[in-house]
Every structure is written in structure tokens, then in C-alpha cells.
Regions:
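Short, small/polar residue-rich loop motifs at catalytic or cofactor-binding pockets
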Residues: 1-2, 32
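Active-site phosphate-binding/coordination module
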Residues: 21-118
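Asp-based phosphoryl-transfer active-site loop
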Residues: 2-17, 90
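Short, basic/glycine-rich phosphate-binding loops at helix/coil junctions
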Residues: 6-7, 68-71, 137-139
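Conserved acidic, metal-coordinating active-site core of Asp-based
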Residues: 97-99, 104-159
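Short amphipathic alpha-helical segments
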Residues: 9, 75, 142-146
Length: 159
């Protein structure tokens, strides 16, 4: 007997606009049969929660590819991140390659330089971003995610 169904959001159960009626009915049916329905995503909880509200998720939500797990209320029940010193080493290295990644700290998106990539990603993820010219001045202990988006495939391959 199946006890749990874990689904991603983007390109799996969500088409970028809405959940289909068939999907919602299927989720409700498996719940009635005692199957736990769980979301696992690379998104932040803030972003994921805006999308999954219509599904009335009552189980923990796995975010950042497993780096955080949240209760449906948003409370973090598990978190693992990159320590500050390692994060800063990575970010400084990326700067030497003229790469300015999306930086996630405490469910917020930061960038050191505004780019078209961060604007588009922010719109897609439904999460606002904050420009911080020097992230090392931000008082964080751990960083949740560093996301590199660049059109230069040679840079990406080299990473």
C-alpha cells in the first residue's frame, strides 16, 4: 500500500498558471485513502506556499532541494545550509568570473548586482529580491542556496 506521494511543483504538477481540476481531485482522493501528499521543490517556502495554497497541503513542505523542511505554517523543522565563511568564499570566487548569483538567506532572495536573470527569476518564483552591493556585510550565519544563472555556457561548464 502506498503511504506517501511526494511531488515537485514546476513542470510536474503545476503548469505555470494553475492546478488542473483532475489533479486536485486526484490529490483529494488519495488523501481520503490515507496517502500523505507532500511537496518537494527547489523553491523557497514563500514562493512554494503561494502556489500550493489551493491544494490545502497539511504535511511538511520540502524546499531548497531538501535544505529546509517547513510545517504548513511556515515554521522551519529542518534546515541545513552553507556556513558563512564557505558561502563568502564561493561568492567571492564567482565575482572573479563576473558572475552574480541569486543568494537565498532565510527565505529571502538577494543579489549583489541587478541583472535580467534575477528580474526574470524573481517574477517566475513569485519572490521579491533585494539588491545588496556587498553580501558580506549582511549578518547571516548560514546561506540556504546559491543559484547561478548565466548565458555564458563556458562559465557554467567551467563551474
Amino acid at each position: 500500500m502506498i503511504k506517501m506521494l511526494v511531488c515537485d511543483i514546476d513542470g510536474t504538477i503545476f503548469n505555470g498558471k494553475a492546478f488542473t481540476e483532475n489533479l486536485v481531485n486526484c490529490i483529494n482522493r488519495i488523501r481520503k485513502d490515507g496517502v500523505k501528499f507532500v511537496i518537494a521543490t527547489g523553491r523557497t517556502f514563500y514562493s512554494a506556499n503561494q502556489i500550493i495554497k489551493p491544494l490545502n497541503v497539511d504535511t511538511p513542505v520540502i524546499c531548497y532541494q531538501g535544505a529546509t523542511i517547513h510545517k504548513p505554517s511556515g515554521e522551519i523543522i529542518y534546515e541545513i545550509g552553507l556556513e558563512r565563511n564557505l558561502s563568502l568564499d564561493i561568492l567571492n570566487y564567482l565575482k572573479t568570473m563576473d558572475i552574480y548569483p541569486n543568494i537565498y538567506i532565510n527565505d529571502r532572495l538577494f543579489c549583489e548586482k541587478e541583472t535580467e536573470h534575477v528580474k526574470k527569476y524573481s517574477d517566475f518564483q513569485l519572490i521579491p529580491y533585494t539588491i545588496v552591493p556587498d553580501i558580506s556585510k549582511n549578518d547571516f550565519k548560514t546561506l540556504n542556496k546559491i543559484l547561478v544563472i548565466d548565458n555564458d555556457t563556458k562559465k557554467i561548464e567551467w563551474l
